[in-house]
Amino acid sequence: MSNNTSNKAIPYKIYLHESEMPTHYYNVRADMKKKPAPLVNPATGKPVSFDDLKPVFCDELIEQELNDTDRYIEIPQEIRDFYKMYRPSPLVRAYCLEEKLQTPAKIYYKFEGNNTSGSHKLNSAIAQAYYAKKEGLKGVTTETGAGQWGTALSMACSYFGLDCNVYMVKVSYEQKPFRREVMRTYGASVTPSPSETTEIGKKILSEHPGTTGSLGCAISEAVEAATTTEGYKYVLGSVLNQVLLHQSIIGEEAMAAMKKYDIKPDIIIGCAGGGSNVGGLMSPFMGEKLRGEADYRFIAVEPASCPSLTRGRYAYDFCDTGRVCPMAKMYTLGSGYIPAPNHAGGLRYHGMSPIVSELYHQGEMEAVSYTQTEVFEAARDFARVEGILPAPESSHAIKAAIDEALKCKETGEEKTILFGLTGTGYFDLYAYEKFNDGLMSDYIPSDEEIEASLATLPNIEG
């Protein structure tokens, strides 16, 4: 057996005390010698200014978006008070998984599913709702894929007394009706996207009748709704710098918990859709690496059906299908790319966080992709030994962690692996049913499909 199960110096779960929770967000851009390229205004072709973003975002969030010099940004007390309802989240030693794999590797996961939204998304939702309330807004609009972000934002808006209008990718809206009902219970209105309620929604429906939607399309609708409705601004759950900033609390807590027991991870793994989770988990560790204080190996894991990092191009592209948002330099499959309706709805995004993209481009991190069948096999195996039913998104990281642990089994190396378990899969049982019935299909886009989508990239130097 790989571990002595009777006498463990490291507990199954490491919890920080409330007094040890982070008081500041960590801004990894401050430690990046080559900063992520700026967002570009599609109308002018120039880097966006504060005034360009003001019609769309809250003022303080714009400040955070554009700030690439301050290493630490204080977390307001009101946000910290809310965090205490479900944070600090546990750092779990996966002893049972290690036993099953018979690996000398030591596996840890940071579990972010201990709240009603079922994921890490609440970390940024409460921050964005706080700044919207502080600005005196009536409400906010947003998009959601699998529904975790929409659920998190509906909770945050309910807490601060804000309206919450959610555009939910149609395939998830249909597959996950109960996620929709959680949002409605918290007072949100939920619209399947693309819809007939916005001009861009009507356009996409006319061009792609019967489409199951995409995150890029839902973003376009949410932005249009915000900019055409008095007293509303747009907020989003991934991709942008401000979101990765808020999510840095995951990595900060993980690092503090590990240091309590003198644990140093060799490999840090996160699933990657828009980059909020992998960016949040890795950023404090990446900061140490960039400052030359420590060395780590970082792995971003994405679905083979939406392989932005592993098969995309590093270029300026629109963040949304309707091309109403600023352009970002990122790894992208093209803003018109609509992936096959796989079950990891939260990873069905054509692009990637500019921060994650730049770090990947510099060779500071790696990326791998998996088909959904092999991801669900890992999810099942994990659930059976660790007692948590993982979200499909999180299960991409589980699969990569298992693969790395099995490599250690072959080599005999005692590496320490840390991965992000972003949330639970209780609302993803339609997907689990397909997997259990042997009806799950794996779709991998052809080179021709990806090239056709990339051919529509805007011609912007950068």
Describe the predicted segments one by one.
Residues 124, 132-171, 264-278, 298, ...:
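A short, small-residue-rich loop immediately preceding and capping a beta-strand
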Residues 111-124, 140-150, 240-243, 269-274, ...:
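Active-site nucleophile and cofactor-binding loops and adjacent substrate-binding regions
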Residues 72-74, 204-242, 250, 262, ...:
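Active-site/ligand-binding loops adjacent to catalytic centers
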Residues 272-280, 372-437:
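Claisen-condensing/thiolase-fold acyl-transfer catalytic domains that form or cleave C-C bonds
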Residues 127-137, 151-163, 184-185, 282-292, ...:
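Alpha-helix C-terminal capping segments
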Residues 141, 149-212, 308-318, 429-437:
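Active-site-proximal loop->helix
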Residues 3-137:
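Positively charged, low-complexity intrinsically disordered leader regions
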